[in-house]
Each structure stands twice: as structure tokens, then as C-alpha cells.
């Protein structure tokens, strides 16, 4: 039976960018339902608007639900999941270039990281958690993604050269994400 996968993009992006269309196509071909959410005003994002977009689009959160997030999409999803009461169990989450601390080069995003996330709550809702980060990420420092991985007690996948995993970094496909997700779905 197919799973429901939500892909949540980051700052300055859209569903048509980077590796999102490729991943969506691959997952649909495997029989999954895939939604690449269109986050509003991505070049001037507002936390409340982004949380509302998740609330309006994420339906039936259960063990067949998986999330793949990129950059700002990661902390947005964690903030969203944390505010659900109760937070149902769900399939898994892969956070690409995720962060939970302020980014010195993008202070306008500070409102997304002000509130500390209740990581234990999210950890207890899913056993399948992964963070992917590149050592040469020029936007989100590698250490911030590593910190997030520790806080969320995830599997951690360091990549030597990936930048911020953007189209301009050469990422129009991203087999690592696809493989990790498939492994998560198999272990269900």
C-alpha cells in the first residue's frame, strides 16, 4: 500500500525547484501519494503563514505519513508537529539542511527559531528520523544541522560536498533522500 509523503521546501524556493520534482515523480511511480507544499512568500516568509499552510494541507497524520523537508521547511515542520495535541504517531521524517538556531546570514528568519522545540514529543511520535547535511553548506552551517540531529536523536548523514543541496549546487536529483525514505518505509 502506498504512503503519503509531504515535501516541504525552504526559503526562496518553490515546488518546481531543486530536486523536488524529481523526487515527487520517483515516489509517485512507486505508488505513493505525494504533495509538494507551496509555502507562501518564500523570499519573505512569515512563520504564522507557513504554519497555517501546513495545518491546511496535512491531512490524516498517521503511520503511513512521511515528511521530507529542506532548510527552513524543517524547523517549520517541527514547530507545527509540536503544537499538535495530541501528536499522532507518524511514519518518519527526513530533514535536509535543517536547523533550529538563528542563521547569522538570514536574521529575518529568527522568528522561526525563537521558540525551542519539544524534541522529546516528536521523538516519541516516530522512530524514523534522519538529518542530511553537507560539510560545505554555505547557507546553513554544517554544525547547526548536526546539532539538530542530536536534539532530535536522528540518524545523521554527512555529505562531503553538497552545498545547500540546491539546483545551483548540482542537485536536480537526490538519490540519498530517496534511498533513506525507502528504507524507512520498509522498516514500518
Which residue ranges define each predicted feature?
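Catalytic histidine-centered segment of alpha/beta-hydrolase-like enzymes
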Residues: 45, 162-174
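Active-site catalytic motif of lipid deacylating hydrolases and related acyltransferases
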Residues: 2-63
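Catalytic histidine neighborhood in serine/cysteine hydrolases
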Residues: 33-35, 149-166
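Conserved alpha/beta-hydrolase "acid-adjacent" motif
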Residues: 138-144
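Active-site nucleophile loop of the alpha/beta-hydrolase fold
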Residues: 10, 39-42, 93-103
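Gly/Ala-rich beta-loop-alpha elbow adjacent to hydrolase catalytic centers
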Residues: 68-78
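Short beta-strand/loop motif that positions the catalytic acidic residue
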Residues: 125, 130-133, 137
Amino acid at each position: 500500500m502506498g504512503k503519503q509523503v509531504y515535501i516541504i521546501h525552504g526559503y526562496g524556493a518553490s515546488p518546481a525547484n531543486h530536486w523536488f520534482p524529481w523526487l515527487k515523480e520517483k515516489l509517485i511511480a512507486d505508488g505513493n501519494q505525494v504533495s509538494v507544499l507551496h509555502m507562501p512568500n518564500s523570499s519573505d516568509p512569515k512563520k504564522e503563514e507557513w504554519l497555517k499552510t501546513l495545518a491546511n494541507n496535512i491531512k490524516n497524520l498517521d503511520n503511513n505519513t512521511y515528511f521530507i523537508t529542506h532548510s527552513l521547511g524543517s524547523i517549520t515542520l517541527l514547530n507545527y508537529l509540536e503544537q499538535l495535541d495530541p501528536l499522532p504517531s507518524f511514519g518518519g521524517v527526513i530533514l535536509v539542511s535543517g536547523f533550529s538556531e538563528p542563521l547569522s546570514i538570514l536574521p529575518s528568519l529568527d522568528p522561526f527559531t525563537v521558540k525551542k522545540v519539544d524534541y522529546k514529543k516528536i521523538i516519541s511520535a516516530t522512530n524514523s528520523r534522519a538529518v542530511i547535511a553537507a560539510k560545505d553548506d554555505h547557507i546553513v552551517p554544517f554544525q547547526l544541522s548536526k546539532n539538530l540531529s542530536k536534539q532530535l536523536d536522528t540518524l545523521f548523514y554527512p555529505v562531503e560536498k553538497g552545498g545547500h543541496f540546491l539546483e545551483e549546487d548540482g542537485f536536480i536529483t537526490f538519490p540519498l533522500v530517496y534511498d533513506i525514505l525507502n528504507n524507512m518505509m520498509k522498516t514500518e
